[in-house]
Curated annotation (Swiss-Prot):
Gene behind the chain: MGD2
Enzyme class: transferase
CC terms in the record's Gene Ontology section: chloroplast outer membrane
GO molecular function annotation: 1,2-diacylglycerol 3-beta-galactosyltransferase activity; UDP-galactosyltransferase activity
Organism, scientific name: Arabidopsis thaliana
Alphabetical list of Pfam families matching this protein: Glyco_tran_28_C, MGDG_synth
Induction of synthesis: Induced by phosphate deprivation. Induced in rosette leaves when grown in acidic soil.
SUPFAM superfamilies: UDP-Glycosyltransferase/glycogen phosphorylase (SSF53756)
Name of the protein in question: Monogalactosyldiacylglycerol synthase 2, chloroplastic
Tissue-wise expression: Expressed mainly in floral buds. Detected in roots, leaves, stems, siliques and pollen tubes.
Catalyzed reactions: a 1,2-diacyl-sn-glycerol + UDP-alpha-D-galactose = a 1,2-diacyl-3-O-(beta-D-galactosyl)-sn-glycerol + UDP + H(+); 1,2-di-(9Z,12Z-octadecadienoyl)-sn-glycerol + UDP-alpha-D-galactose = 1,2-di-(9Z,12Z-octadecadienoyl)-3-beta-D-galactosyl-sn-glycerol + UDP + H(+); 1-(9Z-octadecenoyl)-2-hexadecanoyl-sn-glycerol + UDP-alpha-D-galactose = 1-(9Z-octadecenoyl)-2-hexadecanoyl-3-beta-D-galactosyl-sn-glycerol + UDP + H(+); 1,2-di-(9Z-octadecenoyl)-sn-glycerol + UDP-alpha-D-galactose = 1,2-di-(9Z-octadecenoyl)-3-beta-D-galactosyl-sn-glycerol + UDP + H(+)
Function recorded in the entry: Involved in the synthesis of monogalactosyldiacylglycerol, the major structural component of photosynthetic membranes and in the chloroplast envelope biogenesis. Can use both prokaryotic (18:1/16:0) or eukaryotic (18:2/18:2) 1,2-diacylglycerol species, but operates with some preference for the eukaryotic one. Plays a minor role in galactolipid synthesis in chloroplasts. Is required for membrane lipid remodeling in phosphate-starved roots. Acts as the minor factor involved in digalactosyldiacylglycerol (DGDG) biosynthesis in phosphate-starved roots.
Domain of life assignment: Eukaryota
Documented EC number(s): 2.4.1.46
The keyword Chloroplast is assigned to this record: yes
Amino acid sequence: MATTVMALAEKVLERVYGTSKSAVSVTSGDGEKTHRHTHHHIHRIKSYDDIDEDESSLELIQIGAERTKNVLILMSDTGGGHRASAEAIRDAFKIEFGDKYRVIVKDVWKEYTGWPLNDMERSYKFMVKHVQLWKVAFHSTSPKWIHSCYLAAIAAYYAKEVEAGLMEYKPEIIISVHPLMQHIPLWVLKWQELQKRVLFVTVITDLNTCHPTWFHPGVNRCYCPSQEVAKRALFDGLDESQVRVFGLPVRPSFARAVLVKDDLRKELEMDQDLRAVLLMGGGEGMGPVKETAKALEEFLYDKENRKPIGQMVVICGRNKKLASALEAIDWKIPVKVRGFETQMEKWMGACDCIITKAGPGTIAESLIRSLPIILNDYIPGQEKGNVPYVVENGAGVFTRSPKETARIVGEWFSTKTDELEQTSDNARKLAQPEAVFDIVKDIDELSEQRGPLASVSYNLTSSFASLV
């Protein structure tokens, strides 16, 4: 099937580009797109400001031990996890290797292509707000023959634009942290005859149930966050030599932070003696945050002795309306209401458990902080498998009920403290704080094994159809 799809992709390209190897006019004087009239109009990139128009190809300078190597990380803001992972990898490269690598994080689709690739962020946000729509989209595109044909058609239409994106950054190493950024860049590398010269790796950012588009047999390495994902990679045709299981990349400032709970609580002006629960509303402050907060107040207040048995921190994200509503309440227990936070390692370090939806990044960070997790929701498809990943490993529980959530926290803070401690210990054992460093070290080893390359040429006039 894969061979058939590849042949289909190349036949489509032949129809679009033809077999001529003549040079292509790329821009008009005012920078607007130009079109070459063949059987179809061919959309071109907006400008090549950084390209010498007198040259038909671009040559990278000599690559040697003393030369900084370019690393291009492909991502998209479809959910916050992809950018967070990309930036974590970038920071880890800097910490481990200094100026040996120049790492660029880019959404090439958004910057270089047209619809639907340049509109994925808005489309994704719309669909996850209508979860049944997203569920249908996720599962209907899972069969290989469907997503391969879809991606082949897009590749045929936007190949030159993607090629231009790669030419601008001239990477020796490409890292994909998004499921839709394997097939098309790899096809472009094949058409440019660069697959054996440009290192291409995938870093999967879903903990369990990930979309099949994550897996492409043409990658040099596929970094999986769990054994469950590694099994899926092997099932989808990757070889064991291509697969590594290191964990989910978490930003180094979080993973290696040395934090003392008492000091954090003093800094954050929290009660020093009461156990604390962290209630997450995500970046957009979505979900039953207010209902859960009110339920927690009831279960964390000892009516008989008229005193609190716990305190609460609520992260409202960008939802200012929610933050204002919570701040207006006269709480019976200590409550901290926060907006969009950039220092989550401190708030996590100051708390004793967390309530959140099943986003992989938040789960990975919670495990590093040894926080027992109460999962209260998940996005169908890629987040569904995160629930058994947490629950079956004893690192937390799942319930959508605000009242049940509050009851569990109330028991953890009063009659079931041993269970709280055991769950915390299980979370710590499941954590992989060094994952991002293991990933960049392995990429560096792969790069060194290849040795210095004479040159890497991104040819502006190559005929993609010539491989048919």
